[in-house]
Every structure is written in structure tokens, then in C-alpha cells.
Swiss-Prot record:
SS bonds (residue pairs): none
One record GO biological process: signal transduction
GO CC list: cytoplasm
Organism, as annotated: Dictyostelium discoideum
Name of this chain's protein: Probable serine/threonine-protein kinase DDB_G0276181
Active site residues according to the UniProt entry: 1156
Cross-referenced CDD domains: STKc_MAP3K-like
InterPro entries: Kinase-like_dom_sf, PH-like_dom_sf, PH_domain, Prot_kinase_dom, Ser-Thr/Tyr_kinase_cat_dom, Ser/Thr_kinase_AS, Ser/Thr_Kinases-Pseudokinases
Span of domain Protein kinase: 986-1309
Amino acid sequence: MTSVGTTLIVKPANNSGGSDGNIKNNNNNNNNNNNNNNNNNNSNSGNNSNNNSFIDDQVLHTGYLTKQGGRIQNWKIRWFVLKRGTLSYYLSPINWEYTKPRGVIYLTKKTELKEVDHRNRRHCFAVNPNYISENQSIIQQQQNQPILRSSSDSVNNNNNNNNNNNNNNNNNNNNNNNNNNNNNNNNNNNNNNNNNNNNNNNNNNSKLYPNSTRIYLISAQTVFDKSKWIEMIKLAISSDNSQDSKLKRANHQLEKVKDLVFSNRKGSIPTFPSLLNRTIATESLNDLIKVHLSKKRFYFYHDNLTLPALSYIDSESPVNLQEIHHQHLILLQQQKEELNKKLKKIQQQNNIGGGGSGSNIANSANKINNKNNDKINGVGSGEDKNNNKGGGGDNNSQSSSSSVSPTTVSPSVSPLSSSPTKPPIILSKKPLPTPPRNISTSDNGSGTDSPFYNSAITRLPLISTSVGMVGPNGMVNITSMNTTTTTTTTTTTTAPTTTNTNTNIKPLPGIQQNKLQLIQNKDGGGGGGGVLKRTNPLLSTSAPSMAYNQLVANSGIIHKHQPKIVVFHLVRDSFQISNIGGCSFNFEILSPFDPNFTLNFIPSSGTIQKGDSLTVLVELMAYNHIETDIYSTLHIIGGMEFTLFCRIETDPYLPLFLKSCAGSVLPLEKQMKMESFMKKNPTMVKSIQELAHTLILDGRNIIPLHLSNNININNNNNNGGGGSGYNIGGGSNNSIGGSGSNNNSNVNISNGWNIENSNRRNSGGCLNLVGGSGGGGLINNNINNNNNNNNNNNNNNNNNNNNNNNNNNNNNNNNNNNNNNNNNNNNNNNNNGSGLLSSSPLITISNQNTPTPQARVKLSKYILNFQRNQKKNSVGDVESVKIYQLLTDKFLISNSGSADASFQFHFPSRGKKNDLFSLSLVPTNGTVSKGEWFYIKSTLTVFVETEISEMIQLIINQREVHHILITVKCENIHPGNKEIDLEKEVVLHERLGTGATGDIYRGLISQDNLNRHISNQDSSGSNSSGSGSGHNWLIARNPSNDIINKDAIIGSGPQIIVAVKKLHPLADPSPEMIQDFYNEVRVLSMFNHPNVVKYVGGCTKIANWSIVMEYVPGGNLMDVLANPVLVIPYKLVLRMALDIAKGLHYLHSLGILHLDMKSPNLLVSSLSTSAKVNIKVADFNTCINRSRITAGFFNRHTGSGDNNKVEKDSKKGTTLWMAPEVIRGAMYSEKCDVYSFAIIMWEMVTRKLPYSHIAFNCEVEDQVLKGLRPPIPMHCNKNYTDLMEQCWDDDPENRPYFDTIIHSISKMIESNDITEQKAKASFKGLRRTQSNSTLNLLQVQNNNNNSNNNNNNNNNNNNNNSNSNLNNCNNSSPNLGTNSANNDSGVSVLQTCSDIGVGSTGTNSGTSGTNSGFDSPVIVTKDYHLISNLQKLDLHSNDGSDTNGSQIGFKSDINSKKSSLEVHSKHKSKRFSYDGGSSRASINTLNNDSNLPFKFSPPSTPQSSFLQLKKLDKELKSNLESNAGTKHSFIRYKPSFTNVTSAKSKLNLNNNNNN
């Protein structure tokens, strides 16, 4: 006979048929359960492990690892298998169970495990078994314990213990596989076996370990894999595998269960039937009962999950059901003690009740039993609907329970569903198949579709007969027996349990009922107690139906991993109970109580006929994040018990989102946890927030009533003193109502969930307690303890719908209230005898008749990464975001609800991180009307190189919160960009210039600080100074004799002068200014070219924007050209033009357009013709990338009349240098810079500003569009003029590219060098043969330029004027007058003449009109130094000179062997209009873009091909060879500058890199 309260839990056997894990408590001596595994472990007797295969052969962990060899120190990959006590490795995982391992590492208590670092191997750990030390311990134990006695402990409670002990010993020794009834034989076998195998059974170590000192070095693949292996190996080492410890541990756990069952029964919490509170009556065991369960482990799958990413985890459930989880038992014990304390605290209150009976809302036929039968007259008496009179204490408890027929299931409602009730049904006798799982089914349109996905919700379908019945309409109705345990408790006695079958339950609208109802009487209670009803307010008007509505016959696919439970989502599984015995039996399923979840078995009790099967549905819903194991008990009345196991591991993040999205302020730790989840899982942010908001709007985010931790007592005076009562396990605002005479003690038990929201909603957590009749009435306890209807706002109707079941007609089951009961205080005067406890949710629940309008706001995305408009690189990846880049993004906000919604953005980090980024959202607040949608535009600018991951909140109607994640990783403007702390690293001094956006300062930076910002390429010396020394520009700029205090500079080493462009400080810069600064820094950091100004670094801090550049001492080109003291020879002009062309060609090769090319943006590095670099291009704030240029980039025309004016913002550059297409507003191209280069060429020739006679820029633009160009000087070289005219052609297609321009200028420089070489060679010959101090210049024929010599017919007339006093050549310069018969005559550029003899008068060709003589005299000094062999050409202008002629003067310095030429031009040319057309041939190239910035392709046009130019070079070379034999050769000078005045001025070393 089984004793009362004993729970038998036996490990299931591995047999496929028969009773799977059945424990038979019969009177016979059947010991099959002990002998099922005898033959399974014979092969493991020598492996130092226990013979229990179900435990010892359990594989803890497997995987590939790399192991170092023992003899040969090589590394090999092996398949490792970890079991308790052993770590084996195989060649491969294929059939490793049937193959011999390559090696075994025995894990003992002394095995050491640690992480090591081994050479190049990563993720290594070492295993040191310590076999020698373990063997010594074994030998010592064998000496201390010579004989091992088998354990006499047994889990089985059979009548023949001798057989059990014998069989257990046989199992240990593997000697007897037969179940013999002869005890003596078994005992003899046991003794012999124990004596023979004494050493083999000592501490599960049958043999000594090998005498080896080897340390196994193992390497894992990843650091996570290594941590997992170390953890599992430690677990295998720490586990005790001995049989004694197993039996001891099992008995210890059994005692724990017994203690939980029998101890403190009086104070146990009333709840569902479970191991903690059930009372098992004396039963007679029936040996004909045989039960088979389809499964005893449950893996729940979601019924209506809309977030598949949360559904599965890699988690394994415990295998051994016999070993109940120790921590779980401790947790249950702690919960039990905690709840007992709460009950004792409540019981200490004196609740002196008046008369009146209390009954529950279920309208059961129960009369409340006054255990003491004390007739205490109450304040009043009354009766309920069932005529249960209160008062007088004559109320006797009677329970009427319906008889249960065989194979009959009493119908009820699932606590987690709202299915209608049905009459009792008779199950079919045919066994049912296992229900399929994890099959996607479509919805029937009952409001269960996901509001965010068009696809149907994945459900777990069940076959209809598996849940008992199919209704007439084909709908599946899940039924269960509602087992109600009613305990009437006094201070001294405990009444036995009674089972009531409620068949007339009609749940309240929107409230899902629970099964347990408790009626409790307090001392002094007059006739009746209050009513305790535990409800589960999973209120949802659009929640999916919990009953399955589709028949599925196919078998489902079972997921390999443990499914994860999502809070507030129903999960289900099922199993079958089959009666394979000879009689019918009754069963009941007992589930544990836990405040964090609800586990229901449907049906939870019933009768199964012989040969029939019943499918039991298991429903689970979790309310918080938990990770635990649940052990339930299936009790077969008169038979046996089974342990049912399920693993719960919930998602830890959805509860956080439910609280935060509902408006609750999370603790800092949980807030960081939620934000960390959003940052690590950006793809799930949208889904999980939509799921949370759906649960909130549906009212499913309310914590159930039984989640109670804190107790708050509030006393309210109400009319009447009904029966005392309280509610256990309340939710957010639940009252435990006790009643005294005219004094109701209301105790609020809650865990503090969402108190803030409850207060904001006033009566959102309203509880109404109805006391007994007589003095009892309606106790309406709001959160504010206020019965004023004015504070209930919109929730009054909902509370009345849920709680107004007490009408004046005393009808308990009246769900449809005709009276709205707007005044809750009037309900307190009703003498209802029924006790009612109900709850309303925090979120407004719509009335079924007149639903309350709700707003449903949705966002198109919850993550803003600002990469919508980012370009993609060649690989296809999106380019990284740069600092100071204006980033834009947008998202859609819509309202699909029935009411308007107000919204407002909240920036938690605003004010804290303003120096990092600037974020704006437009609009920031407003209203979204129902059915309306629009875009929210967001702009972001990041100021520093960082990774931003910030949260902003969108608040809807001041109660819903949407969290939007902003994640941007900003890199520096360019890899070459260096951030400089301007205040610490640079010392600013005098201002060099000013501009529209900022000022230019001269500063000093130390060499050490500069080296940290300059790359090796910048310091390679390719950019030499103007002195021609070839050293680094940093060294050349070292101010060794500077008067600046060097101690003021932070850093050591020599100090370097730099130029600092500091922008005007602005507190709130506009986006345009930010982009201009960003653009200039970005472009400068990309460049590395000798003709582009060097970029040192930049300071990108707000209000301290600055750019540190190379200091160029010569100033800008415009100031140099305007300085009259500076002498600029023609050779220098060509070299400066070549430098400018190279710099612009480099920009164009990178796809950069300057668009503001002008002389103020060109810095002069040197004026020496021997310098490698003369000009550097600067000022790049208007640069744009060619790839960003589109037709829509510009505003074409405003359409205002005939002028076709263009918007000012669409034009970049300065008017004087602006190309016609830019003025028209056409699309930019490289030809815009080519036009500006032509204007600069004209500036260098004339040393004037263009269009100086026009006052207004608008007039300049009109004239340029009409074809006006600056006048070309008459003395300018033809090739130079042709190139200049080509570059400023009105049609951009006719303008050459810069590679062609570079080639043309290079040829001009080569031609000029050849001319100089000829001049030097000619005058050396004159110096050897001529002894006179003067030389009469003769007319010679010019072979190179015959078209421009018509103006030089009268040059020989001036020979007599060449007599000058050479003795005063150091102080004065002779004037050589040249009379020109033509006003257009001028002095041409240096050109080579043909060879003639000395004294030759030349030849004049009258027919051709060409003067073949030399134009101007050449003076030779006594020491035969040619005056024209000059190194410096000084050009001055004489405005008062005569216009009919020109004077040429020479200054000669004999001592320094240097001479200069002064040209005084009296000719003033008139301006003329130029229509852009030219009859001269232009030079173009077929290749528009040059890939190499320093290798230029020659022109290949038919007009002037490379072969023609090469032919010209051959002719020049032949002329030089023919002139080598002559005695004299002459050159003629054509000065190339006019109108230059002589003045004295100092050298202005200003660096004006501004506009």
C-alpha cells in the first residue's frame, strides 16, 4: 500500500515498448525495472565509469578540436567526445559510437585544466590528468576500505527488498541478468561478486590509471568554443559518478519532496493542484492498471508568435527525470515560505465580520461553512441568489459534485483561452496518433493576423480528436475538468479538499477565468467569508483564439533545439495517455505554482476506459524572464505516478520593451541592457517594438494578479461589514479585501509593476470587492483609494463592464449590464450577498458595444543609419560616412487607428553630446490624424571621428514610447587628415590676410608635433623650396632667426612656420558653412603634389574651425603681379603657367574641380627661374567632385524675362574669372578651370586685373556672355597668344585639356631655352673675334617667324643712336630709341635669327614685305659680355612716354657680371571686343582624361601633330649646327611687357591664401 503523500519518481527506462518509465507499486515481486539495463553496460566495465548507461554514457559535449601529438609535436584535428569522467577523441564523427577512440583522457578529481598561450596557436588550453596522484589516492583508499558493501538504499517501495538489493548488486557487477525468485542464490552471487570485484567497485575506479605524466595541449577554433569546452570539462570533472552518491542524492531529493509535501500544510498557499498543496487520500492499488505515455518531456512551440527570431535557442533539457533539479526545489521552498509569511501577516488582522454569506461569481452550489458553528449576529442578514442565508452562523458547507463516468472529461474553459464550454463527451476508444507540431496554418480571419506581417501567424495545429471533440461547426473545442480545491481553514483545523465541477461558468467579457476559487472564513466571521477569485487578466479584444481551427493530418517537423518562450505568448504541446491495462482508471495532473508562469493541462483530470487513449493539451504562458525546469506529476488513481518535465527559458528582452514602451522608466541597469540589445541586434529592433506595442494596445502587457511581492494595507470606511476575504496573487492594483463591521481592511499585494501608469490612468487598476449580505456591500478600491467617479476618466465604462455584475436584482451571472453604473458609490448600498473580485487592465479595453477610439502609430523603421544617399565603392559596399558630412535620412509615421495621436520627439542625450554631433528632426512634434501618414526628415552632422549609437524617443499621446536607434560610424574626412589641437600645438601670431569666411595667420608649430601629422610621403622631399636647395619645405621654413618666443610653443625641436586659416567663430553655423569647411578639409587632406599647397592638419572643433597649411612666403600671385619692383621675365611667366597647369591637371586627375581658379588663390613659392616649384594652387573650399555633378545639381534659370538670370547659389567662383557656361548656369566641367587659367595667363602678361574698366560684376557677366575677352597685348608671343585664345573659347568643347596645355607650355619653354643657348653661343663667338666696344647690329633674316616682321623695316635707321657712354653703365642705362612707322609695331619675344657675317647689311625682300633684319641693337661691353645675357628682366612702365615709339634701356653691372634690361613702352593699345571665334588652329587631344597626373600625352590633332612638332625640333637643331661654323650670330629682343613704371618698393612676403 502506498502511504499518504508519498511521491514516487523513477527514471524512465530505455525500452521502446511496454510501460515507458512506469513505476508499478504492486504487491508482486516484479523487478523488471531494476534489470532492464543489465545488458547495456557490459562493455563499459573497464572504462572506470558507472554501469548506469543512461547517466554515464551521456554525451556532454562534442566537437572538433586540434590536439598536439604526444611523441611527434604536430597538431592534428580530432573529433572530441566529452562524457562524465572521460574525454575521448576520434578520427572523425562518422559512427564514432561504434569505433575505438584514438585516445582517452580520464577526468578525475585531481585533473587540472587551465588556459595557456602556446606559440602561434590561439585559444589553447591544457589538460593535466594527474594520473600518478590519483593512483596514490586509490591505493590509499583500498587500504583503508578493504571491503565495499553494496548500498541498501532503494528508490522502489516493493514488498521484497532482498530481491531488490540482490538485483542492484548484480547491476553493479554485471554478473546476473536474470530476475530470480530464490533469494539465497542471489545473495551468494552477490557475496562472491563483491569479494571478487572489491577493487573494481571502489569509487567507480575498477583499475588504476596509467602511469603517465603527459599534459594534453588542445586548441579550439574560437574563443567562445574554448570557453564552452573548458566549462563543460569542469562540469564533467566536478560530477560525482559513484553509485553510492547517486542513491544518496536521489534519497536526499526524495526527502526534500516529502518535506515540501508534509511540512507546513496549514500555511500552504492555495493554488492549482500541485506537489505542494495536494492531499492524497488512501488508495487501493490495482495491479490491472497499465499506462503508456507518448512523451514526458515537452518542448513548447508558439501559437501566435509574430517574431520568429525569438523562437529558438540552443539549450538542452535535463535527461534524468529521477534527479529533480535541486535549485528548483529550493526556489519552490523559498516561494512557499515567503507566501506563508504574507498569509500569516494577513491573518493577524482582526476582521470582525458582520452577517452575510459570500459566494463566488461562478455560482456554485456551495454553502459557506462556518467551521466553529458560532452563531454571531451580524449587522444585517441577507441571502444570495442561491438562498444561502447569512447571519446567525448557521451556514453549513455542502458541496455537490457531479459523478464522473468512465472516459468522461468534465468540460471547462482553459484558463489561458476563451473557448465556450461544452457538455461532457465520451472519448473514442481508438488510440490517437501523436499530434503534429510546427506546421504553419492559415488563419480564419478572426482577427488573429499579425498587424505587421501579411503572412499568416505560425501556429501549432492539433488533430481535432486529440483534444476531445469537434463542435457542430467543425471548430475544435478544448475541454478540461476544472478541478477546484476548496479549503476551509480555521486557526486550528483543516478541512479535506472537495472537488467541484462547475458547468455554468460564463466568463466576463474580456476577462479570462481561472480554475481555482478559495472561500475562507476568519475568526469572528458572522456566517460567511469573503471571496477570493484569482483571475488571469490577459485581456485582448483582438487576441487570437486559443482553440485550433484547422484539421491537420500531416506530421510536423520537430525542431532540434529547445524552443524559447516569449512572454505573453501562448505556447502549447500535447501528449497522449493510453490505457493498455485491464481496467479503466482515473487520473489527475498536478502542476506547480509559480508567479512567473501559468502551466495548464487540458484536461487536468478525467477517466480513461480500457484500451482508450486521451490527448492532453499542455498550455504555458510566461509573464517574466525566467529560466527554469518545471516538474509536474501525472497521478493515476489506484495506480502509479509519472513525472512530466518541461524546460522554460524565456526571452529576457521583451519584458523590458513592454515596460519601456508603455511609458515606465526602467532602472539604469535594465535600460542599458535594452539599449545594448538594440545595438547588437539592429535587425530585430523594428519587430520586437511592433510586437510590444501590439501587446500594449491589446492589453496583454498586464502582469497577472498572482504576481505579488509587496504588501500595502489601505483602510477604507465603507457602508456595511460583509464577509472577510482576500485575493492572493494580484496584479498591479489588486486588493485583498477583509471586512469588519463598517471597517474594510483592504490589503494591496503587488510587485510594483507599472504603478506609474496606473496612477496616470486613475481607475486603470480598479478592483471591486463585494462583501457578504447584511452589512456587506460593494467595496470599490481604486489605486488612489478614491470612489469619485470624476477621477476615472475614460476607464469608468470599462471598469463597469467588467465589474458591474452586482445589480439590484441580485443576478450574479449578468454579464450585459443595461445600467452603466456611472456612480460607483451607489453600488455600495446594494445588499448583494455574492462576493465578486475582478480586475480591469491598465490599458483601456474597448467596450463590445461602443469601442473606445484608439490610435495605432507605426513607424517604417526604427534605425537611422544615414546611408540612404551614400555612394558605393567599386566593390559595391557603401562608402563610410565622413565627419562634417551633411547626412540625411527619413522615415514614415502613420496612424492606422481610429483616433488622432499627438507625437513628440525626446532627445535624452541632447545637451550632453552637442560637441560630438548635431541632430535635427523635422517636425519635432505635432499630430498624426487617423488614416494620415507623412515623412519625418532627419539631418545629422558629426564633428569628430567616432561611432555614434544613440537612442531617441518618440512619445505618442504622452504614454506610448517608440525607441529609435541612431547608429553611425564616422571616419575622418580622409585617411590623410590629421586632427590638430590648435590651442595646444600651434601658436598664432600676426594676421597675414582676411577673407569672407576667415582670416589667415602666421603660426609656429614644433617639429615633433608636425612629424605626427605629416606622412612619410609628405616628408619625402619631393616638394622643395624655392631656393633650389632641394631640401624639405619644412626645413626650409625653419625660422632660425625669428623673434618669436619659442618657449611658448608646446613641444620640442625646431619650430616650423605654418599658415593657419581660421574661420570666423559661429555659435550655430549653418549647414552650408559646415559643408564648405568639410569640403575644403576633405579635399586638402587628399592632395599630395608639389604644385598644390601642403595640408598639415585641421581643427574640427566647433567655434574653433581652422586649417593648418604649408606656409608659402611669396604671397598670392595677384599681389606679386601688382608689385612694380618685382622683375618677372618671360621665362618665369612660362614656368609659372606650367606650374599652375600641372596643379590643376593633378586635381582633374582625381576628379576634383576647383571652380574658383584666380590669381589670389595661387601662392608664389619662388621667383627664381631655376626653382623646381614657383606656384602652388590653394583655396579649395569651392571644389566639388566630378562624380557628384548632375544636371539637377544646378538651378537652370529663374525664367525672369529675357536675361535668363541664374540663382546666385548655383554659381561657384569669382565673376572676373568665371567661365560663360558657369554664368549661364550650365553643368560644371574641367573646362571651367581651363577658362580661368586663360584669364590668369593674361594677368601674367599684362600684370593687370581683367575688365578693370567695367565697374559692376553684372555688366561683366553680360559682356562675357556677348563674347568680350581681355585685350591681347600686341607684343605677346604668337604661340602664347594662340594657347590663351583657345583656353578662353566660348565653346567649352573647343578648349584644350590640361595635359595638352602642359605639353604646349613645355614646348614653349624648350624653345625659349634653345633661344637662350643660341644667344650665349653667338655672343661668345663675338667676344673672341670682335675688339671694338660697340657693334653695329645688322639686319638678318628670320627663318622662324616671318609673319610678324613687317613692322621692323626701319630698325637700321637707329644704328647711329646706339652710341652710348659705356663708362657710366653702372649708374645709368643708355636709351635706344626705336622709331616705328606702324603703331602696331612692338618688340617681339626672343627669337633666333639666321647666321650672317660680321658687317653684313642683310637682305630686304620688297616683294614679300618682310624685313629680314634685326629689330633692335645689342650692346657688347669691353670684356665681351653680352648685355642681353641677363638673369633678371626688369620691366617698368612709363605712362608719360610718347606713343609713337619705345625706349629700351640697359643696366649693366660689370663687377657682378649681371645685367638687366629696362623696357619703357610708350604704346597704349586700345581694348577690343572678341567674339570668341579664332581662325587659328587649336590644339586638342583625343584623350579627355589623363590617368597619370605627371605623364602627359602629346597632342595628336591634324592641325599640329606630334610629328610636325618633332620636325620643327629637327629644323631648329639643323640651324644650330649650321650656325656653329659662323663667326658671328645675332639675336633680337622683343620685350613682352608694356606700360611698366619704375618705382622702388620692398619685397612683400605675405601669404594671402584667401579670396
